[in-house]
């Protein structure tokens, strides 16, 4: 790789260039005096000049503006007299096309080069606000076959403009001043070839003005010329080239000849999504030349920042040997935020601009990126100075950034994070405040510093729920509170409020279950996304404080849930959005969440899309699916909108396991299943029942619970997948539950494995490795009794228990499939519990057993202290009697195996069997295969009473 030029080398090159220009100017002036007499003779006899048959007329530039740097090229086959001019010469003079005969130099025999060129005017971008330049100051070069020639009126004078004004903006953002008139580019090589190929005496010259198109002239006739060197037909297929980062795209319909050209380029790349071809900039010239030779294709070139439709490489080929004017080139760029303290100037090289950069006190130069950066406090100063440079356009930072970083623009702090004051939480329940971890307390401080409007995007398992409750409690005087959550966790939020705000009465919480419920019935109103869209009429009363859990559900502004939620968020004074998976790779999905928190940020999505979504204009409209300037977007969000911490950032503050009860919605249990559950509960409390009959009724109740939980379990799993969970384990016991889960995952095309009692040992190991090595979404559906030991799933950090098991040792062993050697994260354990089912009695029973073992020193695990939302148990005598029955049934030695075998052999459809006639009275229609898992060998439960194995180190 070649090393970049130093400043001294650049200065030396520039000095040599200026010396060469001066020498050439002196030479041209000397030759000009030698030709004065011949030029005067032509002017003195206009009729003779008019009748000269072989005189070639100078070719004007194809630049679309009269003030631009113009190159004039002419092929001279002989040194004859001046060519014919129109009778109405004054009209052509007004347009700047024709010159007076005395202004037209005569070709010098023996000294004319093959091509004759003239450089006139100033830089094209200056056409927007052109200074008045005397005609004598316009620089012009005309080359003969051996020496350069100049007209008598030309003087070599450097362009000077003592007073500079900011350039006016172009009329359209889709075109630059260089090609605003729609003129296609010229290729110097192709023109030279065309001139050489012309017959003797038929030289083609181009005549162009700021308002007319390029026209070739052959044998004294003017003909309209298309944009390429090859004559294009009326029905030629039109397309254009568009910049795409460091490459360019070709937007055009299908053309077999052009596709063949595409395939010959080494940097070709076809995008099947957009159905477009893109190439490296190195192949641009080759592609344009090939496209110009195709009569069926009319390809518009790139729009360059230099104000020309030609690439620098293409135009430079036809201008070899000509002196360039670097001081007249036009550069355009923009400012980009690279940190809280610094911004960067993303712009091409300009000598004047570099000199200005060096005047800034905080300047920094990155050798790798070759870009300059400055402190934010110098942003306004730099932009003001750059506006004094007529050849430079540097766009400042967007208004949104200047508002978000107003304090930094005033006085820059080098701190990586903003200073957040400590919030006064004295009026919040002490139980809640005392249970906040340090990073959670910092999150509450951040939210209050932002006025209660933020996107809390902490990683999953970092306690966004408790932080949101604390933030909302700080603004308790502004309640009623609206909480919008996924349907599967409505009752989990209810339990969380009751746990962390003990001063709150249970009657104050209103969980909306159906579309007929009132949305404003309580001080705290909890509703699902889907029901919110059905209760729009009740949203006329504004809520001042709103919590949105899993706010990424609002990513699509066209959905009913988003249309219902956005008006509520716009009028709310406090908006607390919770999301564990902000879509940083697809900024378009973040837009609705950003404007929900900060409505004044990017009121128009298009401005947001252009800067951060890599917006592209396609034949069918704008494409916002990409991403750009993600570093700047992240800085903006973290400064004003979003707070995000990863598990790796706060791992030292997290426990090894975080257990959580998820109270699933009982409303999903249908009437038939509810009636069966009630009948089974009644059967257990009926008097005059033997112990065996009571135990059979208990097993039936346990099986009915499995059937009742299926819809809510599936809904919760799908919510986890939609929330961005990539890998997790799901444990269940009944075969009907395992089957329902796997069927839904197959229907949703989610990669998963299943291990139950029918899975062989060799197959288990293969499935385990498949799950461990998978990089995509993966769910392991496991049987509690068949896959609770001997397997390692450390690549996941979440375990979901769809069902409870009466022996806590089995549950702990199942948890440890994830919490093993190789696990580098805190493990989340979610227990799905349904009210009104056997879970009401199994969960307290599990806690009681663990507590007894912990007091005896046989277990280090305490479910009560390590689990959220543990305080629920029905208090009426009937429920207590059922709980006692569960406790007595499972406390006898060997009862585990007996009850397990009874549950597995239970056939509710038969009149005989373990359950007797009670199953007939229940009217159950489920068969045995759908209710129980595969039969297990007795050796799988020999470890139940060996509690040391549960507490020994991994």
Swiss-Prot record:
GO terms for cellular component: nuclear replication fork; nucleoplasm; nucleus; site of double-strand break. Changing residue 5 to A: Decreases interaction with RPA2. A motif (Nuclear localization signal) lies at residues 644-661. It is found in: Nucleus. ATP binds at residues 458-465. Ubiquitously expressed, with high levels in testis. DNA damage-regulated phosphorylation by kinases that may include ATM, ATR and PRKDC. Its main location: nucleus. Residues 445-600 form the Helicase ATP-binding domain. A motif (DESH box) lies at residues 549-552. Changing residue 647 to T: In SIOD; decreased ATPase activity; no effect on nuclear location. The modification Phosphoserine is found at residues 112, 123, 129, 151, 198. It is linked to Schimke immuno-osseous dysplasia: An autosomal recessive pleiotropic disorder characterized by spondyloepiphyseal dysplasia, renal dysfunction and immunodeficiency. Arteriosclerosis may also occur in some case. Interacts with RPA2; the interaction is direct and mediates the recruitment by the RPA complex of SMARCAL1 to sites of DNA damage. This is SWI/SNF-related matrix-associated actin-dependent regulator of chromatin subfamily A-like protein 1. It comes from Homo sapiens (Human). The lineage of its organism: Eukaryota, Metazoa, Chordata, Craniata, Vertebrata.
